[in-house]
């Protein structure tokens, strides 16, 4: 039995989401896709580029992936003609401007134990991305950390950082962003049992 037209099998949704993340965050040039400084791309150009990769996708499927993605990674423009990744960009073309926001008392970052020595030495840095990504809750941070090995949760004293001049932003999907988190604002927490 096939799923209804507006539902995708989980494996297909994951594959398409990963393709969109790669193209809209990191490598639009691989399909000749143009992004504006806010990360928007023309949906028709994206569909044509993905088809050239041998993975045809239609507009309805893109809309379904955007609407059902558990992390709300993608956004469609109000007129339905453009699409973008909400955050996570590494391509220098994109320089999204997020509104500054006052963070909650604590934010969280999920990582793996193998990265702790580096984090203890230099804090959290964005690496190839434009910002450090922080979660508003431990469960989300744990899911992120689990992807990379034995997870550990880093608690960020976000209010103290903010009071001391660090700027925070919040993306449309609830992911908190900042330029870096110095080690002095981090506390290691054991990952809770799943």
Each model region followed by its residue ranges:
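Eukaryotic, polar/proline-rich low-complexity intrinsically disordered regions
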Residues: 1-194
């Amino acid at each position: 039995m096939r799923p209804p037209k507006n539902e995708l099998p989980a494996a297909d949704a994951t594959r398409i989401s990963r393709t969109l993340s790669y193209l809209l965050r990191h490598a639009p040039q691989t399909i000749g896709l143009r992004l504006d400084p806010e990360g928007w791309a023309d949906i028709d150009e994206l569909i044509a580029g993905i088809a050239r990769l041998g993975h045809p996708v239609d507009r309805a499927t893109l809309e379904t992936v955007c609407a059902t993605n558990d992390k709300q990674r993608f956004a469609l423009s109000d007129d339905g003609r453009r699409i973008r990744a909400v955050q996570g960009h590494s391509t220098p073309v994109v320089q999204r401007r997020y509104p500054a926001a006052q963070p909650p008392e604590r934010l969280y970052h999920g990582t793996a134990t193998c990265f702790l020595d580096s984090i203890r030495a230099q804090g959290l840095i964005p690496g190839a991305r434009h910002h450090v990504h922080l979660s508003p809750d431990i469960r989300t941070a744990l899911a992120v950390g689990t992807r990379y090995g034995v997870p550990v949760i880093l608690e960020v004293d976000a209010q103290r950082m903010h009071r001391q001049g660090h700027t925070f932003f919040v993306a449309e999907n609830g992911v908190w962003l900042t330029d870096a988190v110095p080690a002095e604002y981090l506390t290691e927490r054991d990952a809770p049992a799943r």
